């Protein structure tokens, strides 16, 4: 819940001096990306900008305090301020900020700028007191903000010092408007106006000039002089002399003598008590001071000129001038040290009564009242956790003595979930085990439903650690003891059960459990678990061979992401990745590539290690097109990631599949030998992870001529795939059986395996799995078509596969990889002119791309060089091959294709 006063423009008071010379400059602010107003405290930064803001419609205001160093809090308020400026235009960004569903601040700002790009009018965002930000993460995010903000947005920052935002570049590009303390200082005319508005008896011009010179136009000093001048002109002179040369750091003594000691005891006590509040209203003042009418007291203090200012048009919220607030807090610590804890407790109660647990926690921490902190957490911690207030909760956990945690074991559970949510998996069991042991020693009984919640969390940790049997046991224990109100833990335990069943190959039960998880998660609005359940359903359906149903389930997941604004969660990449994998199966390669690239965009704000699966997908698409060079480039990136991170078996298996197929196409037996010597061999074959890894092993063995070992593996895989109805794995296994039987001369069995694979493909829709087997597959399909034994559907699929294999070979030729050129030059029928031609590898590539119908610009884009460079290559190859134009080049390439047995 956001505090309204932090998003309210300060109210422009009637007796303020209109800073016309500075307002003229600010009226040009729409021509700049950044307006930077810097000065020490008390020079009128906020007052000036509030005067200017009064005439602006599309303006948002964000007043900072120390708590805004939490990135999540900063983001929520900043987006809320821009929502005010745009009348609620940035709905998606607001939801992301409220639910903390973004990778980091730059990722959130990127989404914000997409929405703001549709807003055509000028926008102004004011951030006051930026000097309070000391979190480098926020500074870095604001540097990103300044680099990428829309042209129609102007950011205005008020700060006591130069912020760490890299403004030098903006200054050079004349996109920075700066106002500093010298310009903010009052001139003679403004000083005269200032005193005329505050004093019943006017000062003459010479006196005003002298007073202005004495304090160098410092607005706060002028205000203090005005307070003294109400007593006598001599008092004003004495104040001016005393303030001459003083700065904010040495103002305390003056404020004690000339302000605090000049007010009545009740006002003094009111000022000191209320100083602990960062913002205040009637209810908070009543709670803190015991006065019956807090609003009346606030307005009276304002009339006395005691450095208090309204924060909104309604006059409900007030705050002290920052300089005076700092002074009062310091005096409160000295004069009311013994009462201070009680004051903070009262403030915490006041904030709780108004529905702001975050502010209440701030005061409970300041009071050092861990019992109160514990009580607040017991009431509000899970709400804060579900709103991703993780850093605030972590601070609370660190402040609570361990003994108090044990007195409230549900807070131990919260502490463990904090570790889990921050991926500190190894700490979770340690925290829970230590707590259970300590509670047993103290003979404190743990409620059965709480133990069940412990087990649900432990089950998730066990699943993350690759221990499905332990996870299953814990999940079952949890579900048996959880109460109806333990919704979150029930969702977790049900999901874990579904994952375990999936790993065992019990796909029908796994699907039912994941559908149950989705229903529970949707009912209780735990949207990220609903998304997780849909992703798991898609994977299970794909394993069952129901790819069309998996595709439709993915559509439901995309819809959930759009509805709940989950685009920046890593699970969005998971969805895009499995969509890419499914589209690849169907040989919809352009769409598969697009999905993988979108997945990489989602991951742009995360560690590069997470890119492995999407890069593998891009490599598979290149491989299926016949562009083996590009596939190898992607594979090199994958191998670099594998060497620098720990990955789930499924991830490694996918990349290993790519490796082995490339080694097969290049007859790289030495690489296969090295890999076989060190690769893991899963204990079971009951799920698609393990089936895939054993297929990789069998393919490597076929490459090395280890046919008996490969056949033994494939027999085992097929037996389990048939028993468990792992239809997609059976489809893949049969294609590998076909390869094996062909190599060992069992042509009849090879044909039977291929026919069954084509039959299963009627259900799975597989195309690319056939295509990557290359010319050997094409040869067998041609024979099957000639036999005229295929059904109409299977015949259509076989013809489609043949076309794609043909296109794959054409692509290989178009790119003229080195192995193809070597084969061509050693062909006995190659013309002497070609054999003796000094064509470079790049010129061969250009010739192939000309044949494929590429224009000069397209060739340049494909090879990532300038068009002029391509023209030079074309001129050279024409000269070397004795041809005159593009048509002759195409004819020459076609003759070479036919000579190599590629009938295109």
UniProtKB/Swiss-Prot annotation:
GO terms for biological process: positive regulation of carbohydrate metabolic process; positive regulation of DNA-templated transcription. InterPro entries: P-loop_NTPase (IPR027417), Sig_transdc_resp-reg_C-effctor (IPR016032), TPR-like_helical_dom_sf (IPR011990), TPR_MalT (IPR041617), Tscrpt_reg_HTH_MalT (IPR023768), Tscrpt_reg_LuxR_C (IPR000792), WH-like_DNA-bd_sf (IPR036388). It holds the Pfam family GerE. CDD domains: LuxR_C_like. GO terms for molecular function: ATP binding; DNA binding; DNA-binding transcription factor activity. Residues 832-897 form the HTH luxR-type domain. ATP binds at residues 39-46. Keywords: Activator, ATP-binding, Carbohydrate metabolism, DNA-binding, Nucleotide-binding, Transcription, Transcription regulation. SMART domains: HTH_LUXR. SUPFAM superfamilies: C-terminal effector domain of the bipartite response regulators, P-loop containing nucleoside triphosphate hydrolases, TPR-like. It comes from the Bacteria. Residues 856-875 bind DNA. Activated by ATP and maltotriose, which are both required for DNA binding. Monomer in solution. Oligomerizes to an active state in the presence of the positive effectors ATP and maltotriose. Belongs to the MalT family. This is HTH-type transcriptional regulator MalT. It comes from Photorhabdus laumondii subsp. laumondii (strain DSM 15139 / CIP 105565 / TT01) (Photorhabdus luminescens subsp. laumondii).
């Amino acid at each position: 819940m956001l505090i309204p006063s932090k998003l309210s423009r300060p109210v422009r008071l009637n007796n303020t001096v209109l800073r016309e010379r500075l307002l003229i400059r600010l009226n040009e602010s729409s021509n700049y990306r950044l307006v930077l107003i810097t000065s020490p405290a008390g020079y009128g930064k906020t007052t000036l900008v509030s005067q200017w803001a009064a005439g602006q419609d599309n303006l948002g205001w964000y007043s900072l305090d120390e708590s805004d160093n939490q990135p999540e809090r900063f983001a929520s308020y900043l987006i809320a301020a821009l929502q005010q400026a745009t009348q609620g235009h940035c709905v998606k960004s607001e939801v992301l900020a409220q639910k903390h569903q973004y990778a980091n601040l730059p990722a959130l700002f990127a989404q914000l700028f997409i929405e703001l790009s549709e807003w055509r009018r000028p926008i102004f965002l004011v951030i006051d007191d930026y000097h309070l930000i000391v979190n480098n993460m926020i500074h870095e995010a604001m540097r990103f903000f300044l680099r990428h903000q829309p042209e129609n947005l102007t950011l205005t920052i008020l700060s006591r010092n130069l912020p760490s935002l890299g403004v030098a570049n903006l200054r050079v590009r004349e996109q920075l408007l700066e106002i500093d303390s010298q310009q903010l200082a009052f001139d003679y005319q403004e000083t005269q106006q200032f005193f005329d508005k505050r004093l019943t008896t006017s000062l003459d011009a010479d006196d005003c000039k002298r007073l202005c010179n004495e304090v160098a136009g410092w607005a706060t000093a002028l205000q203090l002089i005005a307070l003294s001048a109400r007593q006598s002109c001599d008092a004003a002179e004495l104040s001016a002399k005393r303030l001459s040369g003083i700065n904010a750091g040495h103002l305390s003594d003056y404020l004690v003598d000339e302000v605090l000691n000049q007010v009545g005891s009740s006002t003094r006590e009111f000022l000191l008590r209320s100083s602990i509040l960062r913002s205040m209203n009637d209810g908070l003042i009543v709670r803190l001071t015991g006065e019956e009418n807090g609003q009346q007291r606030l307005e009276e203090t304002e009339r006395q000129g005691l450095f208090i200012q309204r924060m909104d048009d309604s006059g409900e919220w007030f705050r002290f001038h920052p300089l005076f607030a700092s002074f009062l807090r310091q005096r409160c610590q000295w004069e009311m040290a013994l009462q201070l804890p009680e004051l903070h407790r009262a403030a915490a109660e006041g904030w709780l009564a108004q529905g702001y647990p975050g502010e209440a926690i701030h005061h409970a921490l300041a009071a050092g009242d861990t019992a109160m902190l514990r009580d607040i957490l017991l009431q509000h911690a899970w709400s804060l956790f579900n709103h991703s207030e993780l850093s605030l909760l972590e601070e609370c956990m660190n402040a609570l003595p361990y003994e108090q945690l044990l007195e409230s074991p549900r807070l131990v559970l919260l502490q463990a979930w904090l570790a889990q949510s921050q991926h500190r998996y190894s700490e979770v069991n340690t925290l829970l085990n230590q707590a259970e042991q300590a509670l047993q020693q103290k003979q404190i009984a743990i409620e059965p439903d709480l133990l069940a919640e412990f087990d649900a969390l432990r089950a998730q940790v066990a699943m993350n650690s690759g221990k499905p049997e332990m996870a299953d046991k814990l999940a079952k224990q949890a579900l048996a003891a959880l109460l109806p109100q333990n919704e979150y833990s029930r969702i977790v335990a049900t999901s874990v059960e579904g994952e375990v069943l999936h790993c065992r190959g019990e796909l029908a039960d796994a699907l039912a459990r994941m559908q149950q998880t989705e229903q529970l998660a949707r009912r209780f609005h735990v949207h990220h678990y609903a998304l997780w359940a849909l992703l798991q359903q898609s994977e299970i359906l794909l394993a069952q061979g129901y790819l069309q149903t998996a595709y439709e389930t993915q559509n439901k997941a995309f819809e959930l992401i759009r509805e709940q604004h989950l685009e920046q969660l890593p699970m969005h990449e998971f969805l895009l990745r499995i969509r890419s994998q499914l589209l690849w199966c169907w040989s919809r390669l352009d769409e598969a590539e697009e999905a993988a690239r979108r997945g990489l965009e989602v991951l742009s704000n995360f560690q590069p290690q997470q890119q492995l699966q999407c890069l593998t997908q891009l490599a598979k698409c290149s491989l299926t097109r016949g562009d083996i060079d590009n596939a190898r480039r992607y594979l090199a990136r994958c191998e670099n990631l594998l060497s620098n991170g720990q990955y789930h078996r499924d991830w490694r298996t996918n990349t290993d599949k790519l490796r082995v197929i490339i080694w097969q196409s290049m007859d790289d037996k030495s690489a296969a030998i090295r890999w076989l010597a060190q690769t893991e061999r899963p204990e079971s074959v009951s799920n698609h992870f393990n089936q895939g890894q054993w297929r990789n092993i069998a393919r490597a063995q076929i490459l090395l001529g280890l046919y008996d070992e490969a056949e033994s593996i494939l027999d085992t895989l097929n037996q389990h795939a048939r028993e468990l109805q792992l239809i997609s794995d059976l489809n893949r296994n049969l294609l590998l059986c076909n390869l094996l039987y062909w190599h060992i001369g069992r042509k009849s069995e090879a044909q039977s395996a291929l026919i069954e694979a084509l039959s299963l493909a009627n259900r799975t829709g597989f195309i690319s799995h056939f295509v990557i087997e290359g010319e050997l597959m094409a040869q067998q399909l041609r024979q099957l078509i000639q036999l005229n034994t295929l059904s109409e559907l299977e015949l259509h699929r076989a013809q489609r596969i043949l076309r794609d294999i043909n296109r794959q070979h054409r692509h290989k030729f178009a790119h003229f990889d080195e192995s193809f050129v070597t084969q061509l030059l050693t062909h006995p029928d190659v013309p002497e002119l070609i054999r003796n031609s000094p064509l470079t590898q790049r010129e061969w590539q250009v010739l192939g791309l000309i044949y494929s119908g590429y224009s000069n610009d397209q060739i340049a884009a494909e090879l990532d060089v300038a068009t002029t460079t391509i023209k030079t290559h074309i001129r050279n190859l024409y000269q070397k091959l004795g041809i005159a134009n593009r048509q002759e080049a195409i004819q020459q390439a076609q003759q070479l294709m036919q000579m190599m047995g590629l009938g295109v």
